[in-house]
Amino acid sequence: DAHAAVYEMAGSLMKRQDLFDATKLSPKDVQRYGTHEFGRHMLLARNMLEAGVRFVKVTSYGWDTHGDNFHGHRSLMPRFDQAYAAIIEDLHERGMLDRVVVIAMSEFGRTPRINGHIGRDHWPEAWSLALAGCRMKRGTVVGKPNDLGTFVDGDAFDIGHMFHTWFAALGIDSTKVEYDNHGQPLPIAHDACSVVK
């Protein structure tokens, strides 16, 4: 049943080619989101959510700044801020923000220490993400790094905690157990983790 429902949703989306037609975008919205690629993709994501798409992923490239970190971020950050703020504002104005979780994250953080190429390397020990929507408490900051920014100071949360948190925000029982074809228990979120509060 679930497979058929997803297949039907995909078929419905394929009939909505108008969602992907850049000539139908409002010039005002294009300016608000930004004329750059990330802005266009975030605007498309908003339109897809309005059309009933249940999961949308938008990727922002160029953050792997092993070299020239600071110049790279000077161009990336304003684009991200512009488009992220625009989609949050639009979802709020349309009454959709209480039904949508907006997640801004990377797969890991960056080294606190600058390398020999004036860049930052991969650093999975301490990093951050931003969440909005779905009844999440606004303005909340959970956790912090130590004074050097090298490790988490206090309780650390991993992706297992994040899945519990996202599912809970969406009203999904994150302790539910699914089963694969061989009857092996497969929880939808790691059972050793819990919701971040």
Tell where the protein language model's regions lie, with residue ranges.
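Ligand-binding pockets and gating/stacking loops
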Residues: 1-197
